[in-house]
């Protein structure tokens, strides 16, 4: 059986927000991992335009430094930012007041997703690749993510099974069939 990914040909333009859809096992996550260099291309090649900086959210969730607080987790990665800037970003992802002092070890799945997304939004990436970013998020968390992405001016390629989220974010659809 030939992989459906061997036959993909697309051009993504600046500012597009493309939802990648298809049945489980068709290669959506493989496509994302290939585009960020975590997996080799199965065939052919891909090329990024000039000055493209990618940011990747993996549905498997990033590993955090054990024992660190939510605040420290961001601050250690972005020491040039002051406390107010860090707390503003955390607030956009629903970490308010004492939430920022929780250790990452006690965070729920949804809180870990929100923290990963907050870290991603601080990167100077102009092309976000998001693999199932709404997994583990409750309605309020999804709304916070939608708001952050709607304020984002770069390009987004994302995998999601959440039809409401797709409708709110996507400007185009890439459907992968098996």
Predicted regions and their residues:
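ABC ATP-binding cassette signature C-motif
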Residues: 1-178
């Amino acid at each position: 059986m030939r992989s459906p990914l061997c036959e993909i040909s697309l051009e993504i333009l600046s500012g597009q927000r493309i939802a990648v859809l298809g049945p489980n096992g068709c290669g959506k996550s493989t496509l994302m991992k290939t585009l960020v260099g975590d997996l080799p291309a199965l065939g052919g090649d891909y090329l990024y335009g000039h000055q493209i900086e990618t940011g990747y959210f993996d549905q498997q969730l990033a590993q955090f430094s054990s024992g660190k607080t939510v605040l420290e987790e961001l601050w250690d990665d972005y020491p040039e930012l002051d406390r107010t800037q860090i707390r503003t970003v955390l607030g956009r992802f629903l970490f308010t007041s004492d939430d920022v002092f929780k250790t990452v070890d006690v965070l729920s799945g949804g809180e870990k997703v929100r923290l990963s997304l907050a870290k991603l939004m601080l990167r100077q990436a102009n092309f976000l690749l998001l693999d199932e970013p709404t997994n583990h998020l409750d309605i309020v968390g999804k709304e916070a993510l939608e708001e952050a992405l709607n304020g984002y001016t770069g390009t987004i390629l994302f995998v999601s099974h959440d039809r409401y989220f797709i409708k709110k974010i996507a400007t185009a659809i890439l459907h992968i069939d098996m």
